[in-house]
Amino acid sequence: DLVNSNETQDEIAAKWNDKKLNESIKLFPKECVYMRWNYKDATQPGHQRILQWYHDKGLKVMGATAASCGSSPFIPRENSLAGYIKGFSKLVAQNQLEGILATAWDDGSPHSETVWRGYIAQGEYGWNPTARTVEAFKAAHAQREFGFHPNDNHMAFLDELEQEAFFFDDALVNSGRRN
């Protein structure tokens, strides 16, 4: 919970015992590229502190976010995680990290097409983290991938499907009788 806390630097330093960490970090190889994984909201204050600490210590670090992760049994959620990807990409630029990549750690769907929009979002925001809004990205994706005119709103069904997927998870997986 230190990563997501709003505690001061001194309070966190006391819990982390960062004097020892600051001494030990000198032993880490400088030629390595270290990965910082975060599949959800990377803009939390603690996570920002960690990225700044890496930068201050001179470590080469890449960000790693997800186009899909374990909460996606058959389709990605939360606009293919585009908001999280955008937020982490901004932090990568601000902290002058080595770059960012998106992974898909979910084998819940046999169709790789279900994660393509997340990968494309990583391309969008990895190159330009201050690019268009997530809604504008979704409209551009629909036009470029499928030829849909943005005003036709043909992709609105995806937003509805994402919301229904949460019901599907609870209705058929958590408890009770399935049949």
Regions found by a protein language model. Name each.
Residues 1-179:
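Substrate-binding groove of N-acetylhexosamine-processing glycoside hydrolases
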